[in-house]
Every structure is written in structure tokens, then in C-alpha cells.
């Protein structure tokens, strides 16, 4: 299996998995044009589309792709049924695509119906988890997003986190504002800054490394707890997560 990233809009990534036979899976195609160009250039045969949630920058290209390739099966949560989904999937179910089983994980928070797809080592997490951050809460609560992030953080160490946006640099600037002396965060920030200066992608990331540099995955970390306690005493990791998300919203 080969993993490919296709840039779209200002900072989106559309992920494509293809096998040796050229069959491919497309994840969150917000725009059809760059996907069609990649399909043509690589002689891919699209078999399926995965949708994580209903926002237009993730579903906008579905109609055109299905018109061009009517054999495509479009998997997605209930909230995407009017966006072109032909196979609604929910938490605990599996999608069998390209000879692989993808587990469906409910991750409410960014939207109420948001889902992720996992087949070792690939995690397609839409707008739930970003490198160095997490998605904004447009529909869900901090408690829901905390539980969603916790689920993803429990996946195997070697999981490849395939996020849908290039937000890494801004996320790491926020992380530095919270933990300015953290060595892992500083090292990763420098690496990301160099990559972005060359207009290079920072994704995918390995989950084991992400747990070290993503403050939203470190709500039980003593260094972070000490920083938060300087401002307010919060007893539960869930409360600390909400504090971080509120800070990030205003950053």
C-alpha cells in the first residue's frame, strides 16, 4: 500500500491509498480537480471514498468524482448522507477496502457525527487530531473531544496519523506558549519550521512522537499540570483539556 497526500485549498490534504494494482481509496476529497489530476497521472482506479464529517472542504469533490467513476463506494457517517455517502458506517463497524479492514471510530467534537478510520498503521482522523493540536469544537463539547482524542491516543505507537490540514506550525507555536522550555516541543518546532520554510508537508506523523509534543495528549503530564495550576486548579484531565482548547481558541 502506498500513501499519498494531495494538497487542496489553502491547507487541506486529501489522502489517497493505492495498492500495487493501482486501485485506490480517497479520503475527504473536498475538491475533485486535484484528485482527478492525480488519478490521471498515476493511472489509479478509484474504488472507495472515506468521509470523516460533513464540512464542505472534506466532501465538496464527492459528486464530481462519483459522476466520473460511478463504481466508487462512498463511506461516511450519518451526517454525510446528503453529501454523497452511499454506505453509512458507525462506531465499531468495519469498511473492507483494497483488501484491508478499516475500523470505524466515533470521534464527536469537531462535529457531532465525526468518525475516523483505522487500519494499522494508517489513521485517517479528519479534523479530530492534528499534529500538535486538535480540531475546533464547532458542534461538540470539550468533554466529547477529550474522549475522542483519548481513543485515538490509545492506538498503537507506530500509527501513522493522517490529518486533514497543515496546521502543525501554528499548533507548535501554541504548544511553545504553554511549555516554552519543553525539549521535545522545541525540537519538533524547529523541525516543522524548517519543513514549512521549504513548503514541505509535515504529515503524516507517528503517534508515539505525537504523544510527546501534542499538549492535548499530555493532560496528565506533570509539567503541563504545573503550568495550569499557576492560573487555576483543575483536578481532572478533561478539565485541563477544556482549558487548553479555550486557550487555543484565543491564541
Swiss-Prot record:
Binding residues annotated for Zn(2+) 1, in chain numbering: 53, 55, 110, 127
Amino-acid positions noted as binding Zn(2+) 2 in the UniProt annotation, renumbered to this chain: 57-58, 127, 165
Keywords: Hydrolase, Metal-binding, Zinc
Pathway(s) of this molecule: Secondary metabolite metabolism; methylglyoxal degradation; (R)-lactate from methylglyoxal: step 2/2
GO biological process, one term: methylglyoxal catabolic process to D-lactate via S-lactoyl-glutathione
Cited InterPro entries: Clx_II_MBL, Glyoxalase_II_hydrolase, HAGH_C, Hydroxyacylglutathione_Hdrlase, Metallo-B-lactamas, RibonucZ/Hydroxyglut_hydro
Listed cofactors: Zn(2+)
Catalyzed reactions: an S-(2-hydroxyacyl)glutathione + H2O = a 2-hydroxy carboxylate + glutathione + H(+)
Keyword match Metal-binding: yes
Molecular function GO labels: hydroxyacylglutathione hydrolase activity; metal ion binding
Cofactor-binding details, from the entry: Binds 2 Zn(2+) ions per subunit.
Listed EC numbers: 3.1.2.6
Domain of life: Bacteria
Function according to Swiss-Prot or TrEMBL: Thiolesterase that catalyzes the hydrolysis of S-D-lactoyl-glutathione to form glutathione and D-lactic acid.
PANTHER family according to UniProt: HYDROXYACYLGLUTATHIONE HYDROLASE, HYDROXYACYLGLUTATHIONE HYDROLASE GLOB
Homology family: Belongs to the metallo-beta-lactamase superfamily. Glyoxalase II family.
Database matches in HAMAP family: Glyoxalase_2
Quaternary organization: Monomer.
Protein name: Hydroxyacylglutathione hydrolase
Native organism taxonomy: Bacteria, Pseudomonadati, Pseudomonadota, Gammaproteobacteria, Enterobacterales
Gene that encodes the chain: gloB
Amino acid at each position: 500500500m502506498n500513501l499519498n497526500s494531495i494538497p487542496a485549498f489553502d491547507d487541506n490534504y486529501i489522502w489517497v491509498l493505492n495498492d500495487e494494482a493501482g486501485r485506490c481509496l480517497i479520503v475527504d476529497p473536498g475538491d475533485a480537480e486535484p484528485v482527478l489530476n492525480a488519478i490521471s497521472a498515476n493511472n489509479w482506479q478509484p474504488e472507495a471514498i472515506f468521509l470523516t464529517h460533513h464540512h464542505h472542504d472534506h466532501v465538496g469533490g464527492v459528486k464530481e468524482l462519483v459522476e466520473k467513476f460511478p463504481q466508487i463506494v462512498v463511506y461516511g457517517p450519518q451526517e454525510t448522507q446528503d453529501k454523497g455517502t452511499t454506505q453509512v458506517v458507525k462506531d465499531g463497524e468495519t469498511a473492507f477496502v483494497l483488501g484491508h479492514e478499516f475500523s470505524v471510530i466515533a470521534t464527536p467534537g469537531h462535529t457531532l457525527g465525526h468518525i475516523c478510520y483505522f487500519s494499522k498503521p494508517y489513521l485517517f482522523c479528519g479534523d479530530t487530531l492534528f499534529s500538535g493540536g486538535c480540531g475546533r469544537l464547532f458542534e461538540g463539547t470539550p468533554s466529547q473531544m477529550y474522549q475522542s482524542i483519548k481513543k485515538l491516543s490509545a492506538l498503537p505507537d507506530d500509527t501513522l496519523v493522517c490529518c486533514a490540514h497543515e496546521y502543525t506550525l501554528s499548533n507548535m507555536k501554541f504548544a511553545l506558549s504553554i511549555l516554552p522550555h519543553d525539549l521535545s516541543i522545541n525540537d519538533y518546532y524547529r523541525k516543522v519550521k524548517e519543513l514549512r520554510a521549504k513548503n514541505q508537508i509535515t504529515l503524516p506523523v507517528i503517534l508515539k512522537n505525537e504523544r510527546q509534543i501534542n499538549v492535548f495528549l499530555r493532560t496528565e503530564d506533570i509539567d503541563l499540570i504545573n503550568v495550569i495550576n499557576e492560573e487555576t486548579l483543575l483536578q481532572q484531565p478533561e478539565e485541563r483539556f477544556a482549558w487548553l482548547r479555550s486557550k487555543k481558541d484565543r491564541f
